[in-house]
Amino acid sequence: MAEKMKLEIVTPYSKVLDELVDEVTATGKMGEFGVLPGHAPFLTSLNIGELCYKKDGQAVSMALNWGYFEVQDDKIIVLVETAERSDEIDLERAKAALGRAEDALKKLTPEDKQFKVYEAALERALIRMQVAGKAARK
């Protein structure tokens, strides 16, 4: 069994990460899951959430927006709309986005077309704040 696995994170705009890592955890449609070297191949969809990987004993957290996560041999490919490392997130901007989403949701009902859009914006802002908080604690 390999000791490390290759992790690639790709957005429509760039390859965000290409590293050898020890383990990965992420948030899928069915909840949080983890992958270690030698894991069986699989493909799953990702929710808005956190991806954490460990490299040489150091944990790195990232905020992800919807996408796909595939394991094949000792390689993980993550295709997502956006991916931000905890130290790249502007906490004030995330708080402002949270406020805008909360304000919009107060004016809407679940039947409104824009309700799901602002609900997702709220979820993204909360995840970004959670992940950014991890960088602040380091």
Curated annotation (Swiss-Prot):
This is ATP synthase epsilon chain. Pfam families: ATP-synt_DE, ATP-synt_DE_N. The lineage of its organism: Bacteria, Pseudomonadati, Thermodesulfobacteriota, Desulfuromonadia, Geobacterales. CDD domains: F1-ATPase_delta (cd12152). It is a peripheral membrane protein. PANTHER family: ATP SYNTHASE DELTA/EPSILON CHAIN, ATP SYNTHASE EPSILON CHAIN, CHLOROPLASTIC. GO terms for cellular component: plasma membrane; proton-transporting ATP synthase complex. It comes from Trichlorobacter lovleyi (strain ATCC BAA-1151 / DSM 17278 / SZ). Its main location: membrane.
